[in-house]
């Protein structure tokens, strides 16, 4: 199917600001789905609240637009009741790791077959530019006018430590790599986490004087490197991108079905 066949054109134009990276993430996701040849009826997109969560309204799949931070909880329920469906959960950095942080670590621990896309623009964009758990030390935000003193989570390390069986990172600059990673994540049986570094030129960019959206994307080009590269050895401050974890361990829903079968047999 063509990419346009996967969207609800009646809801366009979208609400995202000019230069926002979320449209690039959506495009990469739809290209991944298209390349996999997936039917619209075998995909469920579950989102919470925030700029990133508007994706569920734009895609012509089964969709749920749920509560702030609870997308993974809703997605867990859908997956347990309809395990044959492919669950994709786009979340913002606050949605996933602030109010939704508890659900995130337990979904990873259980290894539920969901694809969690953490769209990290380092800010709460929809509600006015407050800092998030991924904003980082020293940045400016509406709730940190004299700089933020919190240090950021490392999403990759957090997901890995919590037990996710697929963990990756991409950026809105490296779109071909991002689409490839998303394909791998969707095909993986288990909890997949894909962090996407995506720009918010309106709140994060202006507040921190980072220039235009193109300037911010240029930073992803210059400040990231493939996993294990020589550049990383020479400059430890570079952010690695690629697939960090990909392992096969028992998937939660499959194991749960075994328990149900045992219970019905009475042993």
Protein language model features and the residues they cover:
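Short catalytic-loop micro-motif centered on adjacent basic/acidic residues
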Residues: 16-18, 89-91, 166-171, 193
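Short coil/turn connectors at secondary-structure junctions
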Residues: 12, 39-43, 81-87, 109-115, ...
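Active-site-proximal loop->helix
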Residues: 101-106, 126-138, 158
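Conserved thiamine diphosphate
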Residues: 3-4, 133-184
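Active-site diphosphate/adenylate-binding microenvironment
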Residues: 2-67
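Glycine-rich beta-alpha junction loops
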Residues: 49-51, 121-123, 174, 197-203, ...
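Flexible, low-complexity linker and terminal segments
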Residues: 1, 11-12, 199-267
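Thiamine diphosphate
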Residues: 49-125
């Amino acid at each position: 199917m063509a990419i346009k066949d996967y969207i609800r054109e009646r809801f366009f134009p979208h609400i995202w600001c000019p230069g926002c990276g979320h449209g690039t993430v959506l495009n990469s996701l739809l290209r991944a789905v298209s390349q996999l040849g997936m039917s619209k009826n075998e995909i469920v997109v579950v989102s919470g609240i925030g700029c990133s969560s508007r994706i569920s309204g734009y895609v012509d799949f089964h969709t749920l637009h749920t509560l702030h931070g609870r997308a993974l909880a809703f997605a867990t329920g859908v997956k347990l009741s309809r395990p044959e469906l492919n669950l994709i959960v786009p979340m913002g950095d606050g949605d996933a790791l602030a109010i939704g942080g508890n659900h995130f670590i337990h979904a990873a621990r259980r290894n539920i077959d969901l694809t969690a896309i953490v769209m990290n623009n380092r800010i709460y964009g929809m509600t006015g530019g407050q800092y998030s758990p991924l904003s980082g030390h020293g940045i400016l935000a509406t709730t940190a006018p004299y700089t933020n003193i919190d240090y950021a989570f490392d999403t990759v390390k957090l997901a890995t430590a919590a037990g996710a069986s697929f963990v990756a990172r991409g950026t809105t600059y490296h779109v071909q790599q991002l689409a490839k990673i998303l394909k791998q994540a969707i095909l993986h049986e288990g909890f997949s986490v894909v962090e996407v570094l995506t720009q918010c030129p309106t709140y994060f960019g202006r507040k921190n004087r980072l220039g235009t959206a193109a300037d911010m994307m240029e930073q992803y080009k210059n400040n990231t490197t493939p996993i294990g590269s020589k550049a990383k050895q020479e400059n430890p401050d570079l952010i690695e991108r690629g697939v960090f974890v990909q392992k096969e361990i028992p998937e939660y829903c499959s194991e749960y079905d075994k328990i149900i079968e045992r219970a019905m047999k009475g042993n």
